[in-house]
Amino acid sequence: MAELVPFAVPIESDKTLLVWELSSGPTAEALHHSLFTAFSQFGLLYSVRVFPNAAVAHPGFYAVIKFYSARAARRAQKACDRKQLFQKSPVKVRLGTRHKAVQHQALALNSSRCQELANYYFGFNGWSKRIIKLQELSDLEERENEDSMVPLPKQSLKFFCALEVMLPSYDCRSPGVGLVEKPVDKVEEGPLSFLMKRKTAQKLAIQKALSDAFQKLLIVVLESGKIAVEYRPSEDIIDVRCEEELHGLIQVHCSPWKQCGQEEEEYLSDFSLEEEEFRLPELD
């Protein structure tokens, strides 16, 4: 049976491994490295998190490991359960099991994670991106020419990007758009700080557009190990081919909106599998 791997933060229990009976000798950082090395042999890992045992338990650690692929997680569980791996005593490995009903909305991967996932399944040369439009929508210059006695409203840098991700081997193209708005005060911050913020906003717009393009792609892993791609366009997606077609698209996406930074995304994605949602299975 084929497995579908979306460009989304893995939150499913069948993609999560619980590892315990970890020795108290090494540090948490050393255990993180050893776990990553051991389990990454079975598939691409999203995260490895190491926790100290509860005070009422014996000294040691346990870990929560997330895979992008449920199939890879199952292989790792079967191969590593009750094995010594990197320590003298065997570890115990189980697939995650939620003990209460918890609903989570899937979070999109940021651009760095998307590229990591694409490189793993398609190869470094198996995909590319093409920027169609990168436009600054700020109105800072106009505001500077206004009467200096009139209080200026809060100014901001705003960049729009439209691009497409191309997969030549699969004859597939996926468009994406991104809009970033960052508050700025050119007088207080100075020219150097303003230029740095401008460069950062421009880069973030490209990253958001890249992530948006990947969200419309679904990796299909066949039983034979071969890879296919499914393109799933949203109803409101416009296939932009030329600059003229971008005008309406820009107008639609220019409304103010609260944005979640990459650091916030990583925090929220890990929060979805906090330790209270899972229990360690009782073993005979």
Swiss-Prot record:
May confer resistance to the antitumor agent cisplatin. Binds to DNA and RNA. Pfam families: Rad52_Rad22, RRM_1. GO terms for biological process: DNA repair. Residues 90-133 are annotated as: Necessary for nuclear and nucleolar localization. The keyword Mitochondrion does not apply. This is RAD52 motif-containing protein 1. It comes from Macaca fascicularis. GO terms for cellular component: Cajal body; cytosol; nucleolus; PML body. Residues 15-98 form the RRM domain. Keywords: Cytoplasm, DNA-binding, Nucleus, RNA-binding. It comes from the Eukaryota. It is found in: Nucleus; Cytoplasm; Nucleus, Nucleolus; Nucleus, Cajal body. The lineage of its organism: Eukaryota, Metazoa, Chordata, Craniata, Vertebrata. C-terminal half contains cytoplasmic retention domains as well as determinants involved in its stress-induced nucleolar accumulation. InterPro entries: Nucleotide-bd_a/b_plait_sf, Rad52_fam, RBD_domain_sf, RDM1, RDM1_RRM, RRM_dom.
